[in-house]
Regions:
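Active-site donor/metal-binding and catalytic loop motifs
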Residues: 65-89
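A recurrent flexible, glycine/aromatic-enriched loop bordering the glycosyltransferase active site
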Residues: 7-27, 89
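Core nucleotidyl-transferase/polymerase catalytic module
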Residues: 1-4
Length: 163
């Protein structure tokens, strides 16, 4: 909260962050020799977070410059508006987006962010119960099953590409 107030008061703030998207990322070429290249197993989605997280793990710093503006060439895939007002981005997108973004985020979160497996699993159960109600309201049962498969593969550390 303190950093949020600081950001509102001064638009020229710098914040240290644990990981970042590729968009707007600047790094010295020698850093690539230390951290290597992005992990191909992620294929798409969360590969940028895993890659930049390695900088932090090796003692480096990622600094967010709040006064810089980045124009992204790609549109955000989960910004589509749904006909069902309760729909989640997890139940409204293509199978490709749903599967890889969910699976990779589950894998990344469990590997690098989770401090308590019990809390994580309880949170996951609550999330899945909420999603089943959304699936019922929006008639998205197949998408819900696909979401569960993606979560299962993330838990099992299965980062193979789908056929």
């Amino acid at each position: 909260m303190k950093n949020l107030r600081k950001l509102k008061e001064n638009s020229n703030c710098e914040f240290q962050i644990p990981f970042a998207p590729y968009g707007g990322l600047f790094l010295h070429k020698d850093l690539i020799g230390l951290i290597g290249y992005p992990n191909r197993k992620y294929f798409v989605y969360a590969d940028d977070f895993e890659y930049t997280n390695r900088i932090q793990l090796l003692g480096g710093k990622l600094i967010l410059l709040s006064n810089c503006k980045v124009s992204d060439l790609e549109t955000v895939w989960h910004s589509k508006v749904s006909k069902c007002p309760f729909v989640s981005r997890y139940l409204n997108q293509s199978s490709f987006h749903t599967y890889y973004s969910t699976r990779n985020n589950v894998y990344f979160s469990r590997k690098y962010l989770v401090n308590s497996n019990i809390k994580y699993k309880v949170n996951m159960i609550v999330f899945l119960f909420a999603m089943i109600f959304v699936a019922i309201l929006c008639m998205s049962f197949k998408r819900y099953v696909f979401l569960i498969i993606a979560i299962r593969d993330g838990f099992r550390e299965n980062l193979d590409e789908m056929a």
